[in-house]
Amino acid sequence: MPKIGNIELPDFPLLLAPMEDVSDPPFRKLCKEQGADVVYTEFISSEGLIRDAAKSVIKLDIYEKERPVGIQIFGAELDSMLQAVDIVEKSNPDIIDINFGCPVKKVVCKNAGAGILRDIPLMVKLTEEIVKRTKLPVTVKTRLGWDNNSIKIVEVAERLQDVGIQAISIHGRTRVQMYKGEADWKPIAEVKNNQRMHIPVFGNGDVDTPEAAVKMRDEFGLDGAMIGRASIGYPWFFNEVKYYFKTGEHLAPPSMQERVDAARRHLQMAIDWKGEKLGVFETRRHYTNYFKGIPHFKEYRMKMVTSDDAADVFDAFDEVEEKFGDFQFA
C-alpha cells in the first residue's frame, strides 16, 4: 500500500485535488465523508501568507475530521516560500504540497505554478529547500511540462524525489494545453515505471468516471488518482469509484433527498465558516452538478446562483425537494 511519509493509505487511494474556490473546508468535509482518502486545500499564495492577507490566511483552516489533509502553497521566490512553510506548519496539516501545475496566467506570469516548468533547476531548488525546512512530508503537484516540446516529466519527477518529496501528483496535460484536449496518462506511467522511483505516483486529469479510475489503476499502473473537476458539486464520486472497484458495478446515484440534504449542509457549513455573503457566493459553483439531469430546472438553478440571501437559497432547496422529490436520477 502507498504511503506519504508515515501516512498509510489504502490500495489505490483517491485524493481530492486542490482547486481554487472549490476545495474549501466545507467541501473537503463532504468529500471525506464520501470516500476521499486524502484532501488538499485550495492553493495558497506564499506572498499572501506573508502579508497576512485574510483571503490567504483563511484557507489554512482545517477540520480535524478531514485528515489526512495537505495544505498547498505556490510561489517562485525562495524566501517567501520558506516563510510560508513556517506559517503553514502552525496550522498542523499532515502534508505540505507545492503547486507546480496551476496554468492560470496571473500565476504563471510570476514564474509560479506551471510557470516554473520553464525553469526546472529553480523548481528543484525550491523543493529541496522546502523539504529541508519542514518535518512534514512534502508532495508536489505538477504537469507534464510547459508544452509538447518540453515534456521531461520522468527526469523532473526523479530529481524531485532525489531532493526528498514523498509523493507526486501529475496532471496529464502541459501548461499550454490548459484543460483542452484529452489528458495523456502515458508519460505519468513512464514516471511510475522508472525503476529509480519509489515514491507514490498519482495521476490527475480526466478521471471523470469509475471506468477511468480503473483504467488508470489497471492499464497505467499508477498508485492512486487525484480527482478534480468530477467531484465539483458531486462529492459522491469517490464512493462510486470505490464501489466500482469492489463490484464492477455502478453504485446507484444519490437520491433527490440526499442531494438536497448535501446542498443544505454544504451551504450551512460555508456560512458558518465564512459568513452569509461569502458562504452563499462560494457554494454557487456546485449547484449545477448537485442537481444535474433534472428537466425544466433552470428557474430553480437561477434562484440558487443569483440570490445573495441564504434564506432564498434554502427556500429554493425546499421547492426542489417538493417539486422533484420523486425524480429518479439515471
Which residues make up each language-model segment?
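Flavin-dependent oxidoreductase catalytic cores
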Residues: 1-330
